[in-house]
């Protein structure tokens, strides 16, 4: 049907009914999935997870081709393995280089991007036929604190506040569906609503903490939204992003 058109073949596969099965587990219907009654349940790969965060936030730069880029990385990440030249003193790009697809991230095998290796990206020292897939507390902490995750959550929060509706529940449901491609259950909505109110109270009592959170990342925070409100929604927007990873 699609001779040598791999992109068309991939699209055909991912849009098929078999590929788009629900991953919800049913204790009564094929609980062990021996009959393939549901889709597999696993987190996104390292590159896809980062790209999804950038896309949802509106930060993703979809330019194709060009040289490698240098997104955010911990300070001094290259210094321990290089003592001279361009491979010492890692410095992140400014502007669009921070938001290109992970495919274009510069890769140093002796000091690979920590946020990639943390989510089981191959180290590129040898060929990898099949990636390992782990779920660790450190991965969740990374999605809560890493610069790209926090900045993307803030921009996603701005998007939710502007486009998600007029009430908190409307916005929470809209943002949840945007990230997970499904509507939240009532219990999930209640948990998000409770967390939002707690965060809002905390930032109202400590506005300096709200300002500190909004300075994470190179993209400035929206000036037309109250700082405490935006900070609270930043943490709330991070929840479905974290859970989807």
What are the residue ranges of the model-derived segments?
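Amphipathic alpha-helical segments within well-ordered protein domains
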Residues: 1, 141, 157, 173-180
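C-terminal structured "cap/appendage" subdomains that terminate the fold
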Residues: 164-234
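Short, solvent-exposed turn/loop segments enriched in Gly/Ser/Thr/Pro and often Arg
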Residues: 12-16, 25-26
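Residues at helix-coil transition
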Residues: 14-15, 145, 180, 197, ...
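An acidic, gly/pro-interrupted, aromatic-rich
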Residues: 7, 20-171, 219-245
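Loop/turn elements at helix/coil->beta-strand transitions in domains of secreted/extracellular proteins
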Residues: 2-11
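Short, basic alpha-helical nucleic acid-contact segments in DNA-binding proteins
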Residues: 1-3, 19-20, 199
């Amino acid at each position: 049907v699609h001779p040598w058109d791999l992109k068309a073949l991939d699209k055909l596969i991912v849009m098929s009914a078999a590929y788009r099965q629900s991953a919800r587990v049913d204790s009564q219907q094929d609980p062990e999935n021996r009959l393939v009654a549901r889709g597999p349940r696993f987190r996104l790969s390292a590159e896809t997870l980062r790209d999804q965060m950038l896309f949802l936030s509106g930060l993703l730069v979809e330019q194709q081709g060009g040289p490698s880029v240098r997104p955010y990385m911990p300070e001094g990440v290259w210094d321990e393995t290089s003592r001279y030249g361009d491979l010492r003193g890692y410095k992140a790009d400014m502007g669009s280089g921070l938001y290109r697809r992970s495919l274009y991230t510069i890769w140093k095998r002796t000091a690979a991007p920590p946020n990639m290796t943390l989510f089981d990206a191959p180290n590129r020292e040898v060929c990898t036929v099949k990636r390992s897939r782990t779920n660790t507390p450190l991965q969740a902490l990374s999605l809560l604190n890493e610069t790209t995750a926090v900045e993307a959550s803030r921009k996603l929060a701005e998007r939710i506040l502007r486009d998600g509706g007029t009430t908190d529940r409307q916005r929470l449901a809209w943002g949840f569906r945007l990230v997970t491609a499904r509507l939240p259950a009532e219990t999930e909505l209640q948990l998000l609503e409770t967390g939002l109110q707690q965060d809002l109270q905390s930032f109202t009592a400590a506005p300096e903490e709200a300002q500190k959170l909004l300075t994470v990342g190179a993209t400035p925070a929206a000036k037309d939204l109250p700082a405490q409100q935006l900070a609270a929604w930043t943490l709330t927007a991070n929840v479905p992003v974290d859970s989807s990873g």
